[in-house]
Regions:
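Enzymes that bind and transform nitrogen-containing heteroaromatic metabolites
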Residues: 1-195
């Protein structure tokens, strides 16, 4: 069975989004990144294991697919942007009750019962499934017990307030799969729900 992997940028105090419009992530997904080379390599390594990318409707409408499609074209030989090419090539699934059909290449829309749709994806063939979306989408997946692995990219920032992913429901206990600090100040911690 394929794993559902939730990747989230997070502040040291556990927020995944700021209430104010301020830059706090080491990389805000633009052309300039404060990530060090080792972090970039490790980030790309995750994408080599993926078969499917699950996205929230909002993430797609805010330009996720267009942005990374453009990055793949703009930086075709840049090793750091190899993940962008993988996003273009991978199957994408958008969870939405509002979109009727996909207008993006290699992308389909699923609606209705989210746990049923995710279970069907997990039963499918291919590599693991990465999830990208906002706090609400991530919280819904967590509350439904659908996440098999958390990859938390903990930025060296304290927000004090904002959006969290574990407020609605969380796991009473997580098992640490690994944690790695990087020279740029990022710590990537990987957890699985305790059995």
């Amino acid at each position: 069975m394929r794993k559902l992997i939730l990747q989230m940028q997070m502040s040291v105090d556990g927020f995944v989004g700021s209430d104010e419009d301020r830059r706090w992530q080491l990389w805000e997904w633009g052309d300039d990144s404060a990530w060090d080379e080792e972090l970039k390599q490790d980030f790309n390594a995750v994408f080599t294991t993926l078969g499917t990318i699950l996205l929230s409707r909002k993430m797609v409408e805010e330009g996720y697919l267009t942005h990374w499609g453009n990055a793949a074209k703009k930086y075709p030989k840049d090793r750091f942007y190899a993940f962008a090419q993988r996003i273009v090539e991978a199957e994408k699934v958008v969870a939405s009750d509002k979109l009727a059909a996909s207008r993006w290449e290699r992308t389909r829309v699923v609606s209705g019962d989210l746990p049923r749709e995710v279970d069907a994806l997990k039963q499918g063939d291919g590599g693991d499934i990465a999830v990208f979306g906002g706090a609400g989408f991530a919280s819904a997946l967590i509350a439904a017990g659908l996440v098999d692995e958390f990859q938390l990219f903990i930025n060296p920032a304290v927000l004090g307030s904002g959006r969290r992913i574990f407020d609605k429901s969380g796991f009473a206990r997580l098992t640490l799969l690994g944690s790695k600090p990087y020279a740029c100040g990022m710590v990537v911690s990987r957890y699985a729900p305790a059995q």
